[in-house]
Amino acid sequence: MASISTWFRYMAHKLEYSLTLSLKSHRSNKLSDRELIQIICKNLFYGKITYLHSDKGPEMSPTMTANENTLLIRKIPIANTRFVFIGDAVVLKDPNDSDKYLVRRLAAVEGFEMVSGDEKEEPFVLEKNQCWVTAENQELKAKEAYDSRTFGPVSTADIVGRAIYCLRTAVDHGPVRNSQTAMGQDSPILAVELDVDEMAKNHKA
């Protein structure tokens, strides 16, 4: 059971998420003050800031297996350097199919200079709101990995979450290694919202 201090930290993250998401909706939909307050309260008191996501494939080995994995994903209201960090295992829309989602490591963000191992390719700098994502499996070739080496930079707006826990099998599961900053932020969320039994029930063997 989570301690009182952990609950306070969890509620602080939940409040930040609720406010950020509600203000985002307000800017796009021009909500009334009453509607804005209702959404904030709904997200704060009734919603979760995590969800379950299934994924498989060799691209994220060893964090994930080639078989089915059930992931606990922390929702990201706005994908910027305040919420996601280099080294995080992020969930993003497939740049070639917006109905599908990928799990990849965030390798670089706007302002980073990207230098290819191929001398024929010119270095370039990631533009505003661009990021570079890579597969974790070092044994895969670039085309097999299906990451930014294949489809290029992606919009940070396409990042929807961060994987914080992975259930590979009923007896093989644990927290996902992310940046130190992210893992520190995610620890109270794991303490409160992680339900391994629920993950196991949703797991597709």
From Swiss-Prot:
First-tier enzyme category under EC: hydrolase
Localization, UniProt: Mitochondrion inner membrane
Gene Ontology BP annotations: signal peptide processing
EC number: 3.4.21.-
Keyword Hydrolase: yes
Disruption phenotype annotation: No visible phenotype.
Source organism, top-level taxon: Eukaryota
Keywords on record: Hydrolase, Membrane, Mitochondrion, Mitochondrion inner membrane
Active site residues of this protein: E59, R104
Gene3D superfamilies linked: Umud Fragment, subunit A (2.10.109.10)
UniProt-recorded Gene Ontology molecular function terms: serine-type endopeptidase activity
CDD domains with a match to the protein in the record: S26_SPase_I
Signal peptide: none
GO cellular component, one term: plant-type vacuole
Family: Belongs to the peptidase S26 family. IMP1 subfamily.
Complex and partners: Heterodimer of 2 subunits, IMP1A/B and IMP12.
Purpose of the protein: Catalyzes the removal of transit peptides required for the targeting of proteins from the mitochondrial matrix, across the inner membrane, into the inter-membrane space.
Protein name: Mitochondrial ATP-independent inner membrane protease subunit 2
Lineage: Eukaryota, Viridiplantae, Streptophyta, Embryophyta, Tracheophyta
Gene label: IMP1B
